[in-house]
Swiss-Prot record:
Belongs to the DENR family. This is Translation machinery-associated protein 22. InterPro entries: DENR/SUI1_TIF (IPR050318), DENR_C (IPR046447), DENR_eukaryotes (IPR005873), DENR_N (IPR048517), SUI1 (IPR001950), SUI1_dom_sf (IPR036877). GO terms for biological process: formation of translation preinitiation complex; nuclear-transcribed mRNA catabolic process, nonsense-mediated decay; ribosome disassembly; translation reinitiation. The SUI1 domain may be involved in RNA binding. It comes from Candida glabrata (strain ATCC 2001 / BCRC 20586 / JCM 3761 / NBRC 0622 / NRRL Y-65 / CBS 138). GO terms for cellular component: cytoplasm; ribonucleoprotein complex; ribosome. It comes from the Eukaryota. One of its GO terms (molecular function) is translation initiation factor activity. Interacts with the 40S ribosomal subunit. Residues 97-168 form the SUI1 domain. It is found in: Cytoplasm.
Amino acid sequence: MLKEVVYCGVCTYPIDYCEFSGKLKRCKVWLKENHADLYDKLYSEDDAAAASLSAKLAESSIGEAREEKLEKDLQKLQTKQENKEQRELAKKLSSKVIVKREARTKRKYIVAISGLEVFEIDMKKLAKTFASKFATGCSVSKNAEKKEEVVVQGDVLDEVVAYIHSLLEEKGMKDVKVETIDTKKKKKPEATPAAK
């Protein structure tokens, strides 16, 4: 018998696992607003237990001071977590993806894609996707800055840029800059015959 699984709108875990996400308070608020019946089923005992525990703590004067301190610590921890998430999002939005086309020998090219490690994209899977999508050789290697980059053999610059745009849109990052660099080998200027 199949059971329908409800996923949390805050942490994207199944609602039974929200406590492991570190965002339990916000998850509870979301669940109460969107699925009140499930909220009552999962957290009604917890709320009753918390109420009785706080009543017991309120009876002792040491418990009140301790509870206030714990609440302040919890509040600080939550604000730190929110600030960290905002910094990570700002870092993702401010970073850019660089797609560089380089000429090899004769009429052969490679396309090197760097800057994707910030977006939590599995580079090996992406390389495999490019290899099958463009029917070319593709690998993951370290560039001069010791960062991973995907190297695609062939002149597929436009297709790669379009695919990366769609990939970032799926992740909700369509504001990220995708910079293309086209480096072509310069031809040697022909020597002009010396004037006699």
